[in-house]
Amino acid sequence: MRIGHGFDVHAFGGEGPIIIGGVRIPYEKGLLAHSDGDVALHALTDALLGAAALGDIGKLFPDTDPAFKGADSRELLREAWRRIQAKGYTLGNVDVTIIAQAPKMLPHIPQMRVFIAEDLGCHMDDVNVKATTTEKLGFTGRGEGIACEAVALLRKAEK
């Protein structure tokens, strides 16, 4: 078994909505990013790539490449997952923690889990998403941005 950890953060800027876990969430602010700014899927993609020793999202989909301008993070996740599967791995489980003072994530978490399970071709029981605040401390607590951490467990596929 192999474990990977991912982290991502984006500052608020411009107008909303925002996309988190593949879900469009109404909010007065947007997130500044080269792609769609989906911190949850970026952290998850990094965790999966790390577990497979395939680098990180910035290596695979560099923000210096215009091809990824405004990219759909679900597509990036699916492409990373194809590469991981090609290396002979299957999914154990994933756990995603969104860190944001606002907007509230709880109403959107069920759909995030559905999208992630679809993109990874796994059962929803293998996908956990949760959200927390920092009790108004730090940049997320001041409403300056959103952060996310993710962990992933991979297994070598049986032959």
Swiss-Prot record:
GO terms for molecular function: 2-C-methyl-D-erythritol 2,4-cyclodiphosphate synthase activity; metal ion binding. Pathway: Isoprenoid biosynthesis; isopentenyl diphosphate biosynthesis via DXP pathway; isopentenyl diphosphate from 1-deoxy-D-xylulose 5-phosphate: step 4/6. GO terms for biological process: isopentenyl diphosphate biosynthetic process, methylerythritol 4-phosphate pathway; terpenoid biosynthetic process. It is an enzyme of class 4 (lyase). Involved in the biosynthesis of isopentenyl diphosphate (IPP) and dimethylallyl diphosphate (DMAPP), two major building blocks of isoprenoid compounds. Catalyzes the conversion of 4-diphosphocytidyl-2-C-methyl-D-erythritol 2-phosphate (CDP-ME2P) to 2-C-methyl-D-erythritol 2,4-cyclodiphosphate (ME-CPP) with a corresponding release of cytidine 5-monophosphate (CMP). Belongs to the IspF family. This is 2-C-methyl-D-erythritol 2,4-cyclodiphosphate synthase.
